Every structure is written in C-alpha cells, then in structure tokens.
Amino acid sequence: MLLSPVTSTPFSVKDILRLERERSCPAASPHPRVRKSPENFQYLRMDAEPRGSEVHNAGGGGGDRKLDGSEPPGGPCEAVLEMDAERMGEPQPGLNAASPLGGGTRVPERGVGNSGDSVRGGRSEQPKARQRRKPRVLFSQAQVLALERRFKQQRYLSAPEREHLASALQLTSTQVKIWFQNRRYKCKRQRQDKSLELAGHPLTPRRVAVPVLVRDGKPCLGPGPGAPAFPSPYSAAVSPYSCYGGYSGAPYGAGYGTCYAGAPSGPAPHTPLASAGFGHGGQNATPQGHLAATLQGVRAW
C-alpha cells in the first residue's frame, strides 16, 4: 500500500528534499516577497487556485499521480513559488503597466530640474547683460592742458571750484573729480618709482684731493732748500710772517730782539723804550730773527 503525498513522514526522502528546497527557495528567489503590486498578488491567487483544485481532485488516487508525474514532488506551495520565480525572469504585463507610473514620477522630476536649471541660467545671464561698462570719456587736448595747468596750481579742489572748472571746460563735476583723483594717484606712483630707482642706484661718492704733508716720517718739502712744498692755499700762512721785516722801529726791535739766541746783538740806541727795560737788540737784527723763527716753526710743524 502506497502512501499518499498529502501524508508525510519525517524520515522519508521526499520530506528531506522538501526541507532543503524550502531553505533554498527563500534565499534564491526573494523577488516574490519584494514585489507588492496588486497585479502580482492577483496573479499569485489565480495561479494558486488551479493547483489547489488539481491537488484536491487527485487526492483519491495516489498511484495515478505518481505515474503521471505532472505534479512536482515538492507539494502545491512549492510549485506555486517555483512557477512564480520562473515568471519573474520573463517580462510581465503587470510590471510593464506599473512601470509607467514610476517612470511618470521620475520624468517630471527631471523636467522640473532641467527647467530649474534653465531658469537659474537665465537669471545668471541677465545680470551679465545688465552690467555693461560705461564708455570711456575722452578729453580733448585743450581740456587736458587746462586741467594740468590747474592741477599744478592746486591739487585739491573744493566743490564750488570743481563746478566752476567743469562749466568752463564743458565737463561734468564728476569727470573733473575723477580726473584729479587719477592725476594724484599718477603723481604718487611716479614718486614711488623714483625713490625705488634712487635706492637701487646710490650716488657715487665725491673725491676730495688731500695734500700730502708727511711721507715716510719726513715732511714733504719742495725743490728749494728752504722753501716749503705747500700748495697755493697754504702759502698765505707764510706771508704774514715776512711782513715783520718792515717794522724796523726801535720799539718793536727792542721788544723781540732778546728772544732768539742766534740773532747777533749790538749796541742798542738810547731810546725811551730801551731805557724802560724792554731788552737789547739791534735794529738790523730784528727782521732776520723773525725770518729764522718762522722757518724753524714751519719745519717743526
């Protein structure tokens, strides 16, 4: 007597194989659990009802079911899951019908994004078109000369002076104001550049001629035996001493005659200054004594 497929035993081969299939089916085909569209649920119900009716109709004759072999050995539930998994690989009309809904929700989003980008691009282009640079004001040569002349006289103008100058030159007050600002900035830049040039190229030191008075520990004398080798500025220092030769009077001769030992002494004439005790000295010896003292002082110096 054969057992019907409805009854199960825990030690039969079919039950062991069915347990393995139940473990492998949820892991291998998770798609039936993920899909939750109403078309899919309707398809599962329609697919499961004939299977159930066939199972109940074939429940009386178990031997005929075995010989037929149309029923898979896993049971009705597994057959429904396997058929559902096979149908997943094929394109289904239910999914195609549902896909436009999802696509419809995405397409408007892209359209909105594109339109937003286009709007932003239009807004960003509008300020660029509005920011047009004003044309440059060209001054005539007469206006530039008049402005330069006034700038040399006065670098800063008050509002009334600016208005008066602008009306005289047929310009606006703003144009005159901007011209003076640019001119002041130009002068400042020129001063800075000039200072940098002077700092980069310092002035050469001046050379001053210095006369050589002593060389190798000896005074530098001229070719003459007694004439000192001084340049023209220093020759004036000797000339005052030579003028003492003209003073041959008794008062001066008497006072300076005894100061030098090398001067010859003679009888001094009887003068009031000599009797007063100013010393003895000859009239002719005084100029020679002065010249000798002058030469000795210059040589020692």
Curated annotation (Swiss-Prot):
Its main location: nucleus. It comes from the Eukaryota. The keyword Nucleus applies. GO terms for cellular component: chromatin; nucleus. Residues 132-191 bind DNA. Changing F151L: In CTHM; impairs transcriptional activation. Residues 22-135 are annotated as: Disordered. SUPFAM superfamilies: Homeodomain-like (SSF46689). Gene3D superfamilies: Homeodomain-like. InterPro entries: HD, HD_metazoa, Homeobox_CS, Homeobox_NK-like, Homeodomain-like_sf. Keywords: Activator, Developmental protein, Disease variant, DNA-binding, Homeobox, Nucleus, Transcription, Transcription regulation. GO terms for biological process: atrial cardiac muscle cell development; cell differentiation; digestive tract development; embryonic heart tube development; epithelial cell apoptotic process; epithelial cell differentiation; epithelial cell proliferation; hypothalamus development. Transmembrane segments: none annotated. Pfam families: Homeodomain. GO terms for molecular function: DNA-binding transcription activator activity, RNA polymerase II-specific; DNA-binding transcription factor activity; DNA-binding transcription factor activity, RNA polymerase II-specific; RNA polymerase II cis-regulatory region sequence-specific DNA binding. It is found in: Nucleus. The keyword DNA-binding applies. Acts as a transcriptional activator. In conjunction with NKX2-5, may play a role in both pharyngeal and cardiac embryonic development. Belongs to the NK-2 homeobox family. It is linked to Conotruncal heart malformations: A group of congenital heart defects involving the outflow tracts. Examples include truncus arteriosus communis, double-outlet right ventricle and transposition of great arteries. Truncus arteriosus communis is characterized by a single outflow tract instead of a separate aorta and pulmonary artery. In transposition of the great arteries, the aorta arises from the right ventricle and the pulmonary artery from the left ventricle. In double outlet of the right ventricle, both the pulmonary artery and aorta arise from the right ventricle. This is Homeobox protein Nkx-2.6.
